From Swiss-Prot:
Alphabetical GO biological process terms: negative regulation of DNA-templated DNA replication initiation; regulation of DNA-templated transcription
UniProt-annotated location(s): Cytoplasm
UniProt cross-references to InterPro entries, sorted A to Z: Arc_rbn_hlx_hlx, Ribbon_hlx_hlx, SeqA, SeqA_DNA-bd_C, SeqA_DNA-bd_C_sf, SeqA_N
Role played: Negative regulator of replication initiation, which contributes to regulation of DNA replication and ensures that replication initiation occurs exactly once per chromosome per cell cycle. Binds to pairs of hemimethylated GATC sequences in the oriC region, thus preventing assembly of replication proteins and re-initiation at newly replicated origins. Repression is relieved when the region becomes fully methylated.
HAMAP family: SeqA (MF_00908)
Any one GO cellular component localisation term in the record: cytoplasm
Keywords (A to Z) from UniProt: Cytoplasm, DNA replication inhibitor, DNA-binding
Family label: Belongs to the SeqA family.
Quaternary assembly: Homodimer. Polymerizes to form helical filaments.
Protein name: Negative modulator of initiation of replication
One matching Pfam family: SeqA
Keyword Signal belongs to the record: no
A GO term, aspect molecular function: DNA binding
Length: 197
């Protein structure tokens, strides 16, 4: 195994270029450096106590062992490049930043903010997401407060939208799932987003 130490600034740059949660440092660097995928390796990146990162690369298997895996990659690569052309919340969400959010409400607002940044023009569709007796989203704090009691409205960061946060985690997950679906994500993607909470 090989290890490299990188400074905090470089680590932040690599992390900010993450396109999907769980993407390896090796994959990100290959994309940034425009390297071909002939010798794809995954890296394990660990943050040490002094905020220095250590990257561990596994041994490269012989070329004969790589061939079957590489034969299966082209369709996945083509599919991924098609997705990258479209606005995608997975390009904006950063796992490290998500983990730093304070509690469930913090993560909830962070994910909604990522949806807003990705889909500013279509985000208005979330206003149609409602409960049986409750309004979940509004364009003003007053609209939420007037729609029911105990709403605890919070502003979705950098947007004119407000969301009701006085609900349990299961309800918040359902709301994220509905937001993803109304913005055009597949059921599988919506479930993945829901599980980030």
């Amino acid at each position: 195994m090989k290890q490299i130490d990188i400074d905090d600034e470089l680590y932040q740059y690599i992390a900010s270029n993450t396109q999907s949660i769980g993407e390896s440092a090796s994959t990100i660097l290959r994309r940034l450096l425009n390297l071909s995928g002939e010798k794809i390796q995954t890296a394990n990146v660990e943050l040490n106590q002094n905020n220095q990162t250590t990257t561990t690369l596994p041994k490269v298997p012989p070329v004969a062992e790589q061939t079957p895996a590489l034969a299966a990659k082209p369709s996945a690569v083509a599919e991924k490049s098609v997705q990258q052309k479209n606005a995608n919340v997975f390009n904006v969400l950063n796992k490290e930043e998500l983990a730093m959010q304070k509690g469930v409400v913090g993560r909830f607002l962070f994910i909604l903010s990522a949806f807003y940044r990705t889909h500013k023009t279509d985000f208005r569709a979330v206003l149609d997401i409602k409960g049986r007796d409750r309004v979940y989203f509004a364009t003003s704090k007053e609209d939420l407060v007037n729609s029911g009691s105990s709403m605890n409205p919070k502003n979705i960061t950098d947007s004119e939208y407000w969301v009701m946060t006085n609900s349990n985690t299961t309800r918040k997950k359902m709301m994220l799932h509905e937001v993803a679906l109304c913005l055009g994500y597949s059921t599988e993607q919506a479930e993945k987003i829901r599980d980030y909470l």
